[in-house]
From Swiss-Prot:
Keywords assigned: Cytoplasm, Methyltransferase, rRNA processing, S-adenosyl-L-methionine, Transferase
One GO molecular-function entry: rRNA (cytosine-N4-)-methyltransferase activity
GO biological process entries: rRNA base methylation
Subcellular location(s) of the protein: Cytoplasm
Tagged with keyword Transferase: yes
PANTHER family assigned to the protein according to its UniProt record, in alphabetical order: 12S RRNA N4-METHYLCYTIDINE METHYLTRANSFERASE, S-ADENOSYL-METHYLTRANSFERASE MRAW
InterPro entries referenced in this protein's UniProt entry, alphabetically: RsmH, SAM-dep_MeTrfase_MraW_recog, SAM-dependent_MTases_sf
Taxon lineage: Bacteria, Pseudomonadati, Pseudomonadota, Alphaproteobacteria, Magnetococcales
Binding site for S-adenosyl-L-methionine: G33, G34, H35, D53, F80, D101, Q108
Chain spans, region Disordered: 282-313
Protein name, UniProt field: Ribosomal RNA small subunit methyltransferase H
Enzyme Commission designation: 2.1.1.199
Gene: rsmH
């Protein structure tokens, strides 16, 4: 099986984890395995990597690397929000480092049958795990009322014309349900004549994808769990691709990098050593971004931001 995906910020992310011989690391978004492969090289000969992915294609494609690494790579089909349960099953108590590469993979975008992109016509699916119990994008489009659709387009897609597009969807589906990516994209484009660089359906597709996969809820849950699973000195690296993801990462990192407020202790003559401590230290004040050379080689990397934090003792 071919799983085409160009790894973003590869060297920067793996360097941020500072892999050590014998360490145990989590790649919560295995994808094409680029980050995991380099991690395994740098924590050799005894270090191991646990790779998670919701996408069965990614797990199947990674089996060759599993065989090559002879017990040092374990792949599990699971969303990264379930990391605590996965590690418990593997009898792993803590991690030396963890990383997440958020968003949709090149393989998912380029496979028309997955329904993530309007560049090629495909079913309006957008499920990262292909789970038949999860509602598809088509199911949301064809059943939710205009207010609920507008909320998805606005809050998850940051689409300015969310209400107008939602009303169009409800009107059109009365004649025939939405079934393909190009059907939806063409309807939206027809409402926005003379658009320039960014296709007018881009934000709507982002909003639907995030809603279908509960991406923001999964991210918030996973980050809180991962911070607790890191060993003192361990690093957590997260690559985000749009402002909604980055805001969550930035907020949770900064909150954990401040000592928790305890109103009961405020103003009491307590020694500094006895006061609550911060959980994380920010490794960089600002996120790392791809070089011009990387963007030229892989234009999809343009919006990537890497934030890194270190667990304090």
């Amino acid at each position: 099986m071919s799983f085409q995906h160009t790894t973003v910020l590869l060297q920067e992310t793996v360097a941020a984890l500072a892999p050590q011989r014998g360490g145990c690391y989590l790649d919560g978004t295995f994808g094409g395995g680029g980050h995991s492969r380099l991690l395994l090289e740098q924590c050799a000969p005894t270090g191991r990597v646990i790779g998670l992915d919701r996408d069965a294609d990614a797990i199947a494609n990674g089996q060759a690397l599993v065989a090559q690494m002879a017990g040092r790579l374990t792949l599990v089909k699971a969303p990264f929000a379930q990391v605590a349960e996965v590690l418990q099953q593997l009898e792993i108590a803590a991690l030396d480092g963890a990383m997440l590469d958020l968003g949709v993979s090149s393989h998912q975008l380029d496979t028309a049958e997955r329904g993530f992109s309007f560049i090629r016509s495909g079913p309006l699916d957008m499920r990262m795990d292909g789970d038949s119990t999860t509602p598809t994008a088509a199911a949301l489009l064809n059943t939710l009322d205009a207010d609920a659709l507008a909320d998805i387009f606005f809050h998850y897609g940051e689409e300015r014309h969310a209400r107008r597009i939602a009303r169009m969807v409800v009107k059109v589906r009365q004649q025939h349900p939405f079934t393909t990516t190009t059907d939806l994209a063409e309807r939206i484009a027809h409402m926005t004549p003379g658009y320039s660089r960014i296709h007018p359906a881009t934000r709507v597709f982002q909003g639907l994808r995030i809603a279908v996969n509960e991406e923001l809820q999964q991210l918030e849950q996973a980050l809180s769990v991962l911070i607790g699973l890191l060993k003192p000195g361990g690093h957590l690296a997260v690559i985000s691709f749009h402002s909604l993801e980055d805001r969550i990462v930035k907020r949770l990192f900064r909150d954990a990098a401040k000592p928790p407020e305890d109103p009961v202790l405020r103003g009491l003559p307590i020694a500094q050593a006895q006061r609550p401590k911060a959980t994380l230290k920010l490794v960089h004040n600002k996120p790392l971004t791809p070089s011009e050379a990387e963007i030229e080689q892989n234009p999809r990397a343009r919006s990537a931001k890497l934030r890194v934090a270190q667990k304090l003792a």
